[in-house]
Structure formats: structure tokens, C-alpha cells
Swiss-Prot record:
Gene3D superfamilies: Ribosomal protein L10e/L16
Family recorded in the similarity comment: Belongs to the universal ribosomal protein uL16 family.
A biological-process GO annotation: translation
InterPro entries associated with the record: Ribosomal_uL16, Ribosomal_uL16_bact-type, Ribosomal_uL16_CS, Ribosomal_uL16_dom, Ribosomal_uL16_sf
Record's keyword terms, sorted: Ribonucleoprotein, Ribosomal protein, RNA-binding, rRNA-binding, tRNA-binding
Protein name (Swiss-Prot/TrEMBL): Large ribosomal subunit protein uL16
GO molecular function annotations of the record: rRNA binding; structural constituent of ribosome; tRNA binding
Job description of the protein: Binds 23S rRNA and is also seen to make contacts with the A and possibly P site tRNAs.
GO (cellular component) term, any one: cytosolic large ribosomal subunit
Organism: Methylibium petroleiphilum (strain ATCC BAA-1232 / LMG 22953 / PM1)
Basic residues composition-biased segments: 1-13
UniProt-listed Pfam families: Ribosomal_L16
């Protein structure tokens, strides 16, 4: 499971996820990518589930890059606890996703196989995604 090894502060404020992705919006490592078209949050478990779906579909071929990392802690209070008495403990980590962000990349496989693998991965994620390929000269 992906999570930061060390943090300066354990807890973080909620914040607002606005704007579109300017960094990480192009396919830069592989030949094909899975790009988010909506904004949202991806938990470490969702990122791992999609990664497994991709790697199982392409079997031994290809190389996969995960372009996102869950670095934002989400805190929760235990069940049946009254309001107040401070903020809950960090329970899991999420990656905040803006539209246009490339989530996964792959190379070393045919386009049809990559498209099928990313379709399986997109089904595991709570946001709409699209298949993209590398721009020549970019």
C-alpha cells in the first residue's frame, strides 16, 4: 500500500481540489496512458487495485508507471463517538486528482492490449478516465 514514510505533520486540513492539472498532464515515460477527466480523490487501495488489474492483464510484458502518490492523510473518528473532543486520527491516504492528470503509463505492449488493461483499471477507479497515447515530439 502506498503511503508517505515520514510527514512533518500527521494531520492535514481538508482544503479544496480546484483547477486542472498542468503538471503531469502528458504521457512522459511510457507509450500509452490513463488520464483522468474528472476531479476527485483516489485512495491508496484504489490505486493499488487498478495497478493489479493492469499488471494481471498484460502478464509479463510491458513496464508500468504509477504517476500519482497518495500523500494527503484523511482522518476519521471512531464509530459511535460523540461530536467534539478534537480531530480523529489519520486512517488512510489519498491522492487529489485534477482533470487532465495522467494516472498510469505503460510501454512495451501493443496498443490494443494497453487499451484493454486501462479499461479494466478504470473500472476500479471512482472517476472517469480516458486512454491517451504519447504525442510525437512532446
Amino acid at each position: 500500500m502506498l503511503q508517505p514514510s515520514r510527514r512533518k505533520f500527521r494531520k492535514e486540513q481538508k482544503g479544496r481540489n480546484t483547477g486542472i492539472a498542468t503538471r503531469g498532464a502528458n504521457v512522459s515515460f511510457g507509450d500509452f496512458g490513463l488520464k483522468a477527466t474528472e476531479r476527485g480523490r483516489l485512495t491508496a487501495r484504489q490505486i493499488e487495485a487498478a495497478r493489479r488489474a493492469i499488471s494481471r492483464h498484460v502478464k509479463r510484458g510491458g513496464r508500468i508507471w504509477i504517476r500519482i502518490f497518495p500523500d494527503k492523510p484523511i482522518s476519521q473518528k471512531p464509530a459511535e463517538v460523540r461530536m467534539g473532543n478534537g480531530k480523529g486520527n489519520p486512517e488512510y491516504y489519498v491522492a487529489e486528482i485534477q482533470p487532465g492528470k495522467v494516472l498510469y503509463e505503460i510501454n512495451g505492449v501493443p496498443e490494443e492490449l494497453a487499451r484493454e488493461a486501462f479499461t479494466l483499471a478504470a473500472a476500479k477507479l471512482p472517476l472517469r478516465c480516458t486512454f491517451v497515447s504519447r504525442q510525437i515530439g512532446a
